Amino acid sequence: NAGFRIATTGTPIENRLSELWSLFRFLNPHYLGSFESFNRRFAIPIERDGDREARLRLRRMIQPFILRRTKEQVLEELPAKTEITLRVEMGEEEFAFYEALRRAAVDTFADGGTAEDRRLRIFAELMKLRRACCNASLVEPGLRLPSAKQEAFLDILAELRSGGHKALVFSQFVGHLAILRDCLEREGVPYQYLDGATPPDERRRRVAAFQAGEGDCFLISLKAGGTGLNLTAADYVVHMDPWWNPAVEEQASDRAHRIGQERPVTVYRIVAKNTVEERIVDLHAWKRDLAESLLEESDAAVRLSAEEMLALIRETR
């Protein structure tokens, strides 16, 4: 019975357009029609078919109700942020291992199965391929192949340390962080570490230590440390593997690019060339374009159908 309603959100479209319908169901019930009607008129034509006219109609309908303020608009004193996608080429052995996994995955899906079973199996194979892009030992423990990403990471780290810089390093895979941790210890690089198993008190202690200058590098699992941390001692951010949801990556980068940061921030995204990771980055761009056309640079995310996920595995460049 309220006379006025307001909804605040950082990501109006985090996974799909139906989330926008949910917001408007609270703000202005029936304005966008029933859920079935919204899907028929907007979500399916826009997301599946790229229907420009449907996109423009939806934009015209929602724009009068949206007030959007970005961090750059409200924090004009914040230093610049530069984003670099670094595409690295796997060595011959590493790519042969990846390609064998990819071909085996495609052959597996010829068996069919229910739609949900098929989607779960495809997702599992995609995760295996994504781990292989990082380090072959994440798929086959004990297999020691040169890792293009590991070499790129060490090159970046050496360069930024020589200039007196510090870095936050994010990965979705805790096993990948463990490999990087071993690298840092061999190289004698002081670091901090945080993942989902880190107790709250220890988490606070490690953040405070890094902010006080203890460590040139902070290894962080993306889901455990992507929000709620102030790590402005770092002016570099390295994403070791692309996450499905670009908004999650951006929130992680903002651990350094936030109030209190006095230096420009550089964000690296390390992507393995000619792999599923490049497909994910391409989908990020497509989804961002979709959201920008509706919400002016909204933080859109990726939720893929079974067919879209299978296309990621089948495609090569």
Where would I find each of the regions flagged by the language model?
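Conserved nucleotide-binding/hydrolysis micro-motifs of P-loop NTPases
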Residues: 11-17, 29-32, 92-95, 138, ...
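Short, conserved loop/helix-junction motifs that constitute active-site signature segments
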Residues: 1-3, 78-79, 231-232, 259-260
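Short, Asp-centered acidic motifs that coordinate Mg2+ and/or phosphate
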Residues: 4, 216-217, 236
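Conserved P-loop NTPase motor "coupling/switch" region that bridges the ATPase
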Residues: 1-73
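Conserved Helicase C-terminal RecA-like lobe
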Residues: 76-99, 112-229, 299-300, 306-317
